Amino acid sequence: MRLEDIRPQPGSTRRRRRLGRGIAAGQGASCGKGMRGQKARKGGGPRPGFEGGQTPLYRRLPKLKHFPRYVRRPQYTLINLRALAKLPAGSEVSLESLMDLGIVTTNDGPLKILGDGEVGVPLTIRAAAITPSARAKVEAAGGRVELVGSQTASAGS
């Protein structure tokens, strides 16, 4: 095999459109560019973001001063203890088990347990993060908390 023997796969290439070669060619006369105007000339049209001389949006908006602290903050799937109150004693709580039960319907990221509500039965909670109040309520009911995933450093957040 030599370099000049290489051919593209059959059906992978299309013939280029020959513009302005007569009406019967399908792209004759104005070559599919409509009538007249800036967009019909060579060189295309105005640059992206040009609004015809009106002050463009990127100049009307205020400048962004420093970056906010929450730009790289991880997104969590949040759930309160109130939603876990109906679970039977000794059940394991994880994002997968909550989605199977229909308690959580969307996966927005790792699971984070918030402390609103009460839990009366011991539960084993496997979550990426848990608030201190939620941890205290779960452990007071006789449950355990296991931190999973890469978010173990921010366990108390």
From Swiss-Prot:
GO terms for cellular component: cytosolic large ribosomal subunit. Gene3D superfamilies: 3.100.10.10. Keywords: Ribonucleoprotein, Ribosomal protein, RNA-binding, rRNA-binding. One of its GO terms (molecular function) is structural constituent of ribosome. The keyword Nucleus does not apply. Signal peptide: none annotated. GO terms for biological process: translation. Residues 1-56 are annotated as: Disordered. The keyword Ribonucleoprotein applies. Residues 23-35 have a biased composition (Gly residues). InterPro entries: Ribosomal_uL15, Ribosomal_uL15/eL18, Ribosomal_uL15/eL18_sf, Ribosomal_uL15_bac-type, Ribosomal_uL15_CS. It comes from the Bacteria. Disulfide bonds: none annotated. Binds to the 23S rRNA. Belongs to the universal ribosomal protein uL15 family. Part of the 50S ribosomal subunit. This is Large ribosomal subunit protein uL15. It comes from Synechococcus sp. (strain JA-3-3Ab) (Cyanobacteria bacterium Yellowstone A-Prime).
